[in-house]
Design a protein with these regions (language model features):
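Beta-strand/loop substructures that line and gate deep hydrophobic ligand-binding cavities in soluble
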Residues: 3, 108-136
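Hydrophobic membrane-insertion alpha-helices, especially the h-region
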Residues: 5-22
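A generic structural signal for beta-strand entry/edge sites
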Residues: 28, 79, 104-106, 130-134
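Aromatic-capped interface at the extracytoplasmic side
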Residues: 18-34
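Glycine-rich portal/gate segments that line the openings of hydrophobic small-molecule binding cavities
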Residues: 4-10, 36-38, 42, 53-56, ...
């Protein structure tokens, strides 16, 4: 019986230490995607800066055919936002915000999906290259 108590206490202690250590683990993940577009930056940047344009061609929203999209003023640039929701599944929704916009240079998005407390931070940079644009 003593051995059983000892093993139980050790197990509870180890599980507690593991749970406590997981509080300090960074859950963020970062990755970089680079794409070269065959148009100048003054043609490419407005497609990312205006959320109505962005929602029409973005792969993220193209596979959400039956979703209800709502856009809020201003419709482009810093402060613009949109929300999306699946009318058939009320728990499938989210919001997209443009938090920073530097003309023809940088955009910073925040994407909230569902009930997740922390948003996705999406930084997009535009680099002009002759008559093309490199998007990172």
């Amino acid at each position: 019986m003593r051995l059983f108590k000892f093993i139980t206490y050790i197990t509870v202690f180890l599980v507690s230490v593991y749970a406590l250590s997981m509080l300090f683990v960074d859950e963020s993940k970062q990755f970089t995607i680079e794409k070269e577009i065959n148009y100048p930056v003054d043609k490419v940047f407005p497609q990312f800066n205006n959320l109505q344009n962005f929602a029409q061609w973005s792969a993220f929203f193209q596979n959400k055919d039956n979703y209800s999209l709502s856009f809020y003023t201003p419709y482009e640039g810093q402060g613009s936002s949109m929300s999306f929701q699946n009318p058939k599944n009320k728990s499938d929704f989210g919001d997209l915000f443009i938090r920073y916009s530097n003309l023809n240079s940088t955009l910073k998005y925040q994407l909230f999906e569902g009930d997740k407390k922390s948003p996705y931070q999406i930084d997009v940079k535009f680099f002009p290259q002759n008559n093309k644009t490199k998007v990172v």
